[in-house]
Amino acid sequence: DLRMSRGLGDVYKRQVQEAFAWNPGFREYFAVKATPNPFLINILKEYGCGCDCSSMTELMMADALGFQGEEIMFSSNDTPAEEFAFAAKIGATINLDDFTHIDYLEKTIGYIPETISCRYNPGGVFKISNSIMDNPGDAKYGFTHDQILEGYKILKEKGAKRFGIHAFLASNTVTNDYYPTLAKTLFETVVEIKEKTGVKMDFINLSGGVGIPYRPGEEGNDIRAIGEGVCRVYEEVLVPAGMGDVAIYTEMGRFMMGPYGCLVTTAIHEKHTHKEYIGVDACAVNLMRPAMYGAYHHITVMGKEDAPCDHTYDVTGSLCENNDKFAIDRQLPKIDMGDLLVLHDTGAHGFAMGYNYNGKLKSAEILLKENGDFELIRRAETPKDYFATFDCFDILKDMKDPYQK
């Protein structure tokens, strides 16, 4: 996996910060789940990003990197008690996913934190104009409308003083209208919450969902237009309600990191049967999205950028699963053994979604720095890593390692 450092700072400083400069309290909480590499997260930390964490290990990483207190947002679901306890210990802002977690959190840590957030799910379908973007009513996340009203009443009674609300209603949207439409839903909801419970929000978290164009020629999101759209709704809904000081938060893992990573793999096999296949030395272990979602990732054959795309291939990995294909019926230049193939836009939800099925090992991660130098920021997995959870037994003591010389 290859990452590019220059783009990471540029996208935040020159795009995201400018887009939301109208909101003094704005903060981007990078979604650690998208790309959990401490070297990359440190780059974003330099620009003032916080961390959006969803698990114990993500909290541990954020804490180890020096993120403190409200620089960490903990948004989890089906949450184990020990994760709530650690989040509270390091002062992270806890974003509750469920009404029953109010009582569960209090019993777990002995109190309700002064700063607390709740995740809202309005149900039904989420539309932009007449287009259905997603189906929140079928999602496992969040409080219902009635639950969130009651929830804030209870949290206030139990001593909470600073409140936030969060919602994620559609994934990987490529439209400048998603955040403004989501914002309108949340802004109107928090006005109602204030009127019915007396709870005034201190921050509103629009979460993620801002996507990137994966296909050449597709028009991407204009984050400045998105920021302007959110600002308009803010002034229409919140300001007249006396809530013109509410901070806006975002959690844009894919938008922040997706375009700035690629998977580099080598053609090692060609097969001519009912179709033309090119086998590469990467597989779904390194990039799961095409196999899991049927997702498109553009492929460049290095050194043949200007060659005609006059061959049709399925580009495959070696897993014992027929869906382990990076491309199906893709028009590409003639591929020879040893050619390097670059799969684009793998910087988010790429390496992070990797796994070890078939005993496959995950690749290294390399950072391409602004000066053109390369830096190893994660070594490749080894067989020793794969078998590490058996290291307290002697059942594999006679195993030979063909990689050891």
Stretches with model-predicted labels:
Residues 1-12:
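Single conserved hydrophobic/aromatic residue that forms the stacking wall/gate
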Residues 180-238, 245-249:
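Acidic, glycine-rich loop-and-beta core segments that form the ion-binding/anion-interacting portion
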Residues 31, 54, 75, 97, ...:
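Generic beta-strand/beta-sheet core signal
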Residues 173-189, 219-228, 263-268, 398-405:
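Short, electropositive alpha-helical surface patch
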Residues 235-239, 243-405:
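Charged (often Lys/Glu-rich) extended helix/loop segments that serve as interaction or gating elements
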Residues 26-203, 212:
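Active-site-proximal beta-alpha core segment in soluble small-molecule metabolic enzymes
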Residues 35, 100, 143-146, 150, ...:
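Conserved active-site and cofactor/substrate-binding residues in soluble primary-metabolism enzymes
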Residues 13-21:
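A short, N-terminal amphipathic alpha-helix
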